[in-house]
Regions:
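NTP-dependent small-molecule kinase module
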Residues: 140-231
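P-loop (Walker A) phosphate-binding loop of NTP-binding proteins
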Residues: 7
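Conserved substrate/cofactor phosphate-moiety recognition/catalytic segment
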Residues: 21-67, 83-87
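A basic- and aromatic-enriched beta-loop-alpha substructure that forms the phosphate/nucleotide-
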Residues: 59-102
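Conserved lysine of the Walker
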Residues: 12
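Hydrophobic anchor at the beta1->P-loop junction of P-loop NTPases
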Residues: 4
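Hydrophobic positions on the alpha1 helix immediately C-terminal to the Walker A/P-loop
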Residues: 15, 19
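A glycine- and Lys/Arg-enriched "phosphate-lid" helix/loop adjacent to the NTP-binding pocket
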Residues: 84-165
């Protein structure tokens, strides 16, 4: 199972689709939706966790099915969902209890996935990294989004915090194989570039060092909820 994570606008969906094409495997893609930009609903009140539940129910089902498939690709992880909720709570856009409830909701459903089957196949977390200014430049390429951020300064603050927290989260991630990719070094629309990433994945798969367990996954998500006062 290949999980493509990373900072905003780093090319996660494009790479996920093309990795699946390269490996002739299945890709589970999250379409652009409200939860990708959680603070955009500030004017409407608090952020609701319920919007994500349908997505997560489907995603949990997909994870269970992909446990024995080393090249099934996901373009978003449940870890990042917990992290986004925590960042939003830290900025005051929803209650801390709501973020905790969200974690508990995911935890409950993860406990029903037969993770013992995961030992039959390798798993890897890719992290697509970008410097903050490059990330913002890419986000600003969508005129409506740029206008919205320019007129709602809290969004810029959110992206700053998210960029730092995503990087910190990946540095502390040690629950499966992982690989950092500098998104500026690759064109994920170019299959030759995609092949370079794929070959790195294959090399790591040849010498796996981790077994995925329920406790490890839950511990990683719990780390997403930990405040870091330096950020």
């Amino acid at each position: 199972m290949i999980i493509v994570s990373g900072v905003y606008s780093s090319g996660k969906t494009t790479l996920a689709k093309n990795l699946a094409k390269y490996f002739h495997s299945k890709a589970h893609i999250v379409e652009s939706r409200q939860t990708d930009n959680p603070l955009y609903d500030k004017a409407k009140g608090t952020i609701s966790c319920s919007y994500d539940e349908d997505f997560l129910m489907e995603r949990m089902k997909q994870i269970g099915e992909a446990m024995t498939e080393p090249y099934t690709v996901f373009d978003r992880s449940v870890y990042e969902d917990v992290l986004r909720m925590k960042i939003s709570a830290d900025l005051g856009f929803l209650d801390q209890e709501e973020a905790e409830d969200y974690f508990a909701w995911i935890n409950k459903r993860l406990s029903k996935i037969p993770l013992d089957r995961s030992n039959e196949a390798s798993q890897i977390l890719l992290f697509l990294d970008l410097p903050f200014h490059d990330m913002i430049d890419r986000i600003y390429q969508v005129p409506k989004v740029k206008e919205y951020i320019m007129t709602h300064p809290f969004l810029y603050e959110y992206y700053q915090k998210a960029h730092l927290r995503y990087r910190e989260w990946f540095e502390n991630y040690h629950y499966s194989e992982k690989l950092r990719i500098n998104a500026l070094d690759y064109d994920f629309n170019n299959m030759d570039n995609v092949a370079k990433v794929a070959k790195q994945i294959e090399e790591i798969y040849q010498n796996p060092k981790f077994e995925i367990t329920y406790d490890a996954i839950v511990d990683n998500m719990r780390q997403s909820l930990v405040n870091n006062n330096s950020i």
